């Protein structure tokens, strides 16, 4: 809002609080969607890893390494989905914190 240390009127504070509440509400949907995407990617990775492991030949270590190498793209998708969820979650928490700060001004 005001970056120059100009005092805010009660109306400005109330408008900012309303804006934060709306952003938090939208953020809940974003977090839920991102988490569902992460869970989908995590299941896909687990499934691909298990299939690659079972199809591989050799010792246990050899099979693990082959499965790991073959499933790197799925792991990357899972990691990207995890990062997106964590980012949305941190943003949601930051907005919630800002809302608490603004409410304490009122």
Model segments located where?
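Short, charge-rich amphipathic alpha-helices with coiled-coil/heptad character
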Residues: 1-27
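Generic structural signal of hydrophobic/aromatic residues within well-ordered alpha-helices
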Residues: 13, 17-20, 49, 67, ...
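Amphipathic alpha-helical coiled-coil segments
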Residues: 20, 24-27, 31-34, 38-41, ...
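Extended alpha-helical coiled-coil "stalk/arm" regions
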Residues: 31-63
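Short, glycine/alanine-rich amphipathic alpha-helical segment
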Residues: 57-84
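Conserved small/polar residues in nucleotide/adenosyl-binding loops
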Residues: 105-106
